[in-house]
Amino acid sequence: MGLGLLLVLAGSPGEAKVGPRAAVGVTISVHNDAAVPWETIRNAEEEASRVFREAGIDVEWANCRGASMVTVAAEKSRSCVESTFPKHLQLRIVKRSIGLRPDVMGISFLSEDGSGCQADIFYEGIEGLRQKTSASLASILGDVASHEIGHLLLGTNSHALRGIMRAVWGPDELDRVTRRGLFFSEKESEQMRGKLGSAEARRKDELWASSGFLGD
């Protein structure tokens, strides 16, 4: 099952910025199958990190292709193939979609229970959109990535009437991309933090139990 982002020329309502909260973390491995320049990837990750930071979520990025990767080979390989919902997700940048409309910018893959670890974004479509707006390529790339990762963390039926999770982005959203003003809503932010926080708590309990320490 997939959830995608469509970009067309249609108006949209505004949104409210969400203030920072106590942060939880998520790791996102990025597969640069479209050979996007490293500087563009880095700037897009900074934009996506900003969006998630406003939602109270810290993102750790693991770049799985390109000469600028800094992790050692073994760690690189492990990080790029392992996924753990919802704490470790995979983002793939591909040249174009297969079988989808050219104005679809990305898609997330969810199972019937609403969980999923992989999202794809489509570089050629984003490049084409860049030629029609004043937003930078990295800003569009980062915000599209945030939308698709948002689907993975929010689950099914997670499109919204406004904000970064709106299904159809029009001039208002694109203007907000330019001004770095596109955000998750407070409700969306709380839902994502809750899911990640619960996963962290379960992981700590498992580590505590596996340590064999019984306490007093």
Q: Where are the regions a protein language model picked out?
A:
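Bacterial N-terminal signal peptides
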Residues: 1-10
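Hydrophobic alpha-helical elements and their junctions with loops/disorder across both membrane
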Residues: 9-11, 55, 157
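Boundary at the C-terminal end of the N-terminal hydrophobic targeting segment
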Residues: 10-18
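Metalloprotease/metallohydrolase-associated module, dominated by Zn2+-dependent proteases
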Residues: 17-20, 29-46, 107-135, 139-140, ...
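Solvent-exposed loop and beta-edge segments used for protein-protein assembly and interaction
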Residues: 20-22, 85
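Short structural boundary motif marking the start of a folded domain
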Residues: 24-26
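Metzincin-family zinc-dependent endopeptidase catalytic domain
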Residues: 38-152
